[in-house]
Curated annotation (Swiss-Prot):
Example of a GO MF term: ATP binding
Localization of this protein: Cytoplasm
Swiss-Prot/TrEMBL catalytic activity: tRNA(His) + L-histidine + ATP = L-histidyl-tRNA(His) + AMP + diphosphate + H(+)
A single GO BP: histidyl-tRNA aminoacylation
Organism: Xylella fastidiosa (strain Temecula1 / ATCC 700964)
Protein name stated in the entry: Histidine--tRNA ligase
EC class: ligase
Gene behind the chain: hisS
Amino acid sequence: MIKPRTPPGVLELLPREQIAFQRMLDVIRRNYERFGFLPVETPVFELSDVLLTKSGGETERQVYFVQSTGTLANAAESGATRLPELALRFDLTVPLARYVAEYEHVLAFPFRRYQIQRVYRGERAQRGRFREFYQCDIDVIGKQTLSIRYDAEVLAVIHAVFSELGIGDFQVQLNNRKVLRGFLESQGVRDGELQLAVLREVDKLDKRGVLDVRDTLIGQGFGIPAAQVENILTFVATRSTSHADALARLDALIQDSGPEAHDMLRQGVAELREVLTLVNVLGVPEHAYRLNFSIARGLDYYTGTVYETALINHPQIGSICSGGRYENLANHYTQSKLPGVGISIGLTRLFWQLRDAGLIDGIAESSVQAMVVLMDEATLDDALDIARRLRIGGINTEVQMEAKKLSKQFQYASRAGIRFVVLAGDDERARGVVAVKDLTREQQFEIPREELASTLQVELEQAKVM
């Protein structure tokens, strides 16, 4: 016999954990829709030449290619060495770029989309790293231009999602790449490629530490003078403590730079100021975000606002949501300029980390809210009728289809995490009531049959409030 097992790099859950995962996914979807984002799904596989048009190196080495056995045999016979025609998507951004470019003539801009689907990467299997995982993305895409105001709205979406998820205190770290690049200009780092390389190093500060990054920037690969490196590291250590402090630090940055401040720096500061002002109007509490000049995001296509979100009491988990502003989403697929701003939540990794940290326990019981006991074979019709009435009343209900011992049926309900067990023996039927055992509160009570569904609904709603 073959030993049943899953391939490495996948997260497979038992039902109660899957329910918790699904509820988190539902919260994310609900909040995305609440802010007016529209659902999009793209195929799990794309044409290789389309998917990989702007990738290479590490990304291409992690791609899963798809090939039918017939095509594989033909390629072997002909000695062909080209890439297979199809490949599994490795993120949702490239498929979005293809999608918007393909349908730009029928889409309404600004195009607000959310996408919640699995993606695939051939990463080395190790603890906490997945080859198949859910990404939950939103993006606002403009045509030619896109107001900076959307950047503030995206931050409000982050706040709404994680407030409802209830997984702990969190904070959004906010920055603007133009501020970083403008400051680098003031320090004599003017070459565009060198600036991007410096930003990638800055993005590694939390993992590698200040000393390591300092040595790298001073070293032969970069050759930046030590004094300028110190200025850069001091600058990226800036953190705001409140909304007013964030605005004050932006003012101070322009004042300290004087009349020679680079235009890019001024533009980045102006954009951050507008985002901060609107975030306040949108009702995001000031403790939920702060200015952090070290946030760069390692991906080079970000050009303006950048976000990273972390749990305050669990910093070891790292970023739980990130994203930013980009100037041209689909330049490889269309001549139209399509600027945008968006974020992504890697839900699979986040769930795994929360479970590993013990933060998932107690989030979910069964999705079945009530179970109707089968007292004996003669009461099957009555049990099915009770279940039907409960379902009509909005209660997720299961019926025991075999008349096992009551203790066995109760044991099943307990192990399955079902809260209410409904019984109707001869006495209860004669009096027009049912007996209900609340396994959570360890209480038993009787309810008139016609009030059963509404009463259980009230109990379930009260449990949500508690």
